[in-house]
């Protein structure tokens, strides 16, 4: 490991195009509309890709663990279950924060479009402590 670099968190690779095809039809329609909205707002391709990756991984979890319910039916407890799954699978604070941001922004969009009365992410606390592990390296007297 290079000096001063943090360990990367474990990626949860659950993306599967066949599973994406099985998403709740109502959810899939809203997800596609959200992607168009991000493009129209001229978010960077990297941001759109990152958000869509997070959302697809979350929705695969919903498909497999939460009966493929519509995102309109999910509540704070359902979202907390997903975040707990991510954390126990090894996601670090930075990755967890992005997941929170991706899902929260999606619900903010749904609220703006009057699809949901409130954003279930609003009362979920986000991780604040950065738990990335940095390996410290010390120079010997000969190296100084």
Give the ranges of each region predicted by the language model.
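Charged interaction scaffolds used for protein-protein
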Residues: 9-16, 27
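Short, intrinsically disordered, charge-balanced linker/junction segments flanking boundaries
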Residues: 140-144
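N-terminal core-binding DNA-recognition domain of tyrosine recombinases/integrases
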Residues: 14-20, 31-135
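N-terminal acidic, proline/glycine-rich, low-complexity intrinsically disordered segments
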Residues: 1-7
